[in-house]
C-alpha cells in the first residue's frame, strides 16, 4: 500500500491553504489521483461541533485550557478513526490541515500545558499513528497575524497575544528540530519561493521514500 498521510502545519497566516494546493498539484503530477482532505479540529460531524466550541468559545462560560485540549483530542480521534485511517486503508493519500503537532505547539507552547500530559494524551488517543510527512510553514507571528487580520474577523485563538504565538512558534521549531519527518519551509518568502521550496521538499521526500517511481507508474 503506497498511500501516505501528509500534514501541513503553521501559525495563522502561514499559507496552509496555498501549500495544500501545491502539495496536491505536485502529487497529481506524479500520478497520485486519490486524495482526501482533512482539517483539524473538524472533519466529522462531531468534530465540527467541537471545532465551533474551540474556535468560538461560549458566551456564558470560559473554556479552560485543559478543556480545550481535551476537546481537540476528542475531535482528533473521531477524525483519525472515522476518516483518515479508512482512507489510508483504501489506498487514498490524505492531506491534513493540522494534526497533533498543532496541539503540541499551541497548547504545549502557547498555553503552557504540561508536555508530559500532552504526550500521554497523544499516545493514549493515537497510539503509534503518526503522519508520514509534516510540512511546517515557519513564519514570524507578527507577519502571520497581519495576514490573518486582513482576512477578516479573528476567532478565539487568533485573538491571542503576540507573546502566545511567539511561544507557539518556538515550540514548533523545537519539535521540528527533533523529528526528521517534519520539514521546515520558510513561509516569509514570496509565494513563488514558498511554492518552489514545497515542491522541492516533497519531491526529495518522495525520492527518499522510494515512492517517486511508484506514484509515477500509473501515468
Curated annotation (Swiss-Prot):
Pfam families: Thymidylate_kin (PF02223). InterPro entries: P-loop_NTPase, Thymidylate_kin-like_dom, Thymidylate_kin_CS, Thymidylate_kinase. The keyword Nucleotide-binding applies. Its EC number is 2.7.4.9. It is an enzyme of class 2 (transferase). GO terms for biological process: dTDP biosynthetic process; dTTP biosynthetic process; dUDP biosynthetic process. PROSITE patterns: THYMIDYLATE_KINASE (PS01331). It catalyses: dTMP + ATP = dTDP + ADP. One of its GO terms (cellular component) is cytosol. Keywords: ATP-binding, Kinase, Nucleotide biosynthesis, Nucleotide-binding, Transferase. PANTHER family: THYMIDYLATE KINASE, UMP-CMP KINASE 2, MITOCHONDRIAL. Phosphorylation of dTMP to form dTDP in both de novo and salvage pathways of dTTP synthesis. NCBIfam families: DTMP_kinase (TIGR00041). This is Thymidylate kinase. It comes from Pectobacterium carotovorum subsp. carotovorum (strain PC1). The lineage of its organism: Bacteria, Pseudomonadati, Pseudomonadota, Gammaproteobacteria, Enterobacterales. The gene is tmk.
